[in-house]
């Protein structure tokens, strides 16, 4: 399937390409709306899968170099399109370790094996399982070579290793944990 096995040498890069739209609560109207990930600031409220709207604790970014090859590796961008992900409002581009949240029945045996080799186990966010986009056959490597600014957000949580399900361009994905956002050498806003 073109997968290259990886062992992470540090915290994973779990980010959205600049321009990704995140579901939030508008501070003035108190209505749900979308805002570009790079425009999110600490204290804004992001829509979660099971916990309503929660405040942002950290906003961070970094620049990554994206190759033009089709290699399925962690440190690159992948694109998810509407034809394969019906809830998407527009294509979603994110880094290889960023997870889409799925039901356990959606995993393939190969995906389970690859994730266990990388992480030691399958991880959950709420009642959904995490599928790193680099292991999702429906996602394709984003083969536009260049430097890209990628962003992520961490929401308030009493446990710094936990995250939430959030909506990016309409797709249910993971937010970043406080631990990972602080260890991953991001620039904080």
Language-model features, listed with the residues they occupy:
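A recurrent domain-boundary module in secreted/ectodomain proteins
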Residues: 2-13
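Structural motif
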Residues: 38-45
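Accessible peptide chain termini
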Residues: 1-2, 189
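Long beta-strand-rich cores associated with HINT superfamily self-processing modules
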Residues: 12-32, 45-188
């Amino acid at each position: 399937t073109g997968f290259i096995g990886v062992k992470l040498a540090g915290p994973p890069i779990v980010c959205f390409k600049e321009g990704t739209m995140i579901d939030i609560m508008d501070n003035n109207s108190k209505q749900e709306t979308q805002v570009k990930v790079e425009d999110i600031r600490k204290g804004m409220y992001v829509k979660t899968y099971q916990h309503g709207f929660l405040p942002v604790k950290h906003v961070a970014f970094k620049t990554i170099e994206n190759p033009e090859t089709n290699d399925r590796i962690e440190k690159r961008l992948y694109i998810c399109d509407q034809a394969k992900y019906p809830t998407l409002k527009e294509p979603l581009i994110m880094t290889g370790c960023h997870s889409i949240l799925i039901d356990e029945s959606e995993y393939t045996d190969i995906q389970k094996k690859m994730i266990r080799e990388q992480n030691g186990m399958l991880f959950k966010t709420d009642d959904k399982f995490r599928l790193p986009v680099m292991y999702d056959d429906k996602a394709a490597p984003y083969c536009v070579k260049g430097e890209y600014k990628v962003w992520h957000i961490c929401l308030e949580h009493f446990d710094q290793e936990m995250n939430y399900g959030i909506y990016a361009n309409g797709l249910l994905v993971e937010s970043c944990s406080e631990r990972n956002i602080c260890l991953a050498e991001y620039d904080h806003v």
